[in-house]
Amino acid sequence: MLRSGVMPNEVSFSSLLKDPLQFHLLQIHSLVTRLGYDGYDYVSSAIISSYASHEMVSDALAYGGLLDPDSCVVSMNVLAGVYNRVRMYEEVKKLLLHQGSNDTVSWSILITACAKNGDYAEAFKIFKRMRICGHHFDRYASVSLLSICTKSNSLVLGSSLHGLIIKTNSGCLDTYVHNILLDMYAKCGRIEDCLKAFKEMEGRNIISWTAVISGLALNGFSHKALAWFKAMEEDGFNPDNVAVTAVLSSCRHGGLVHEGMKIFRHMKSDYSLEPEMEHYICVVDMLCKCGYLKEAEVVIRDMPFQPSAVIWRTFLQGCQTYGVIDAQVFS
């Protein structure tokens, strides 16, 4: 381009900066500066993003700090995203809270920063300010706020937010957000609302099914969790490792030893899955709690890798509970 006498502009620079090699990035940045395109918001944001993607975080932050916040809204959002990535949450707030030209993305980044930093009340205050300023919230803000409700067991807030998402028709109630809702209702003890939200979903995936199965197990409905696991298979979803962990956990809590062992033993043949440590922990705990210590001993002995400290502790507690002292697994 340069050899033919055609000078790059903000569009070509933005395109060049999408995925450059590190050496090329430095050269492009130098050319951007020489040609005076530093002040173009999309070019500046692309430079910050490229530095961050090459793990040159200090360069990204240093460059972003030289820009005018009021004239580079997109760049400030990208810079705030980098601060979030390196857990400098207070810097995110300093950067965006006093900026007069925040957009929906800016507000969402602020809410995410507060959520990750444990400032739950502040996150909802910012959400309120966002709404007062007339900005619609997006899926990122929804996910952060619903996650706060889950962690703080705030069912009223979570349910209200769900209603607001539906009422405003914000377009953010996609499968991902719906899955967060399922998790929130389940962990807040409202399994009926979890099941209702699931039935209202259009784009269910394996995560949706797993959230319901985990929720049923968490709330003491082990038999229902097992039934939903079977329904998931009938609906055409092949269980993944997380889904199997969820159903094994439900069998553990409900004492469904026969059903749990059947799923565990057929993981490879039925689902093409190799049992992982988490599966062994569930199975050993299930067997030990129900007094099947010999069977637990066999499972531990046949493990293809070294048992974890959790497995040993679980097994020893089972031996102590049932007064068994002649386990051969140590020999």
Regions inferred by a protein language model and the residue ranges of each:
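Alpha-helical hairpin repeat boundaries in alpha-solenoid proteins
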Residues: M1-I28, V32-S331
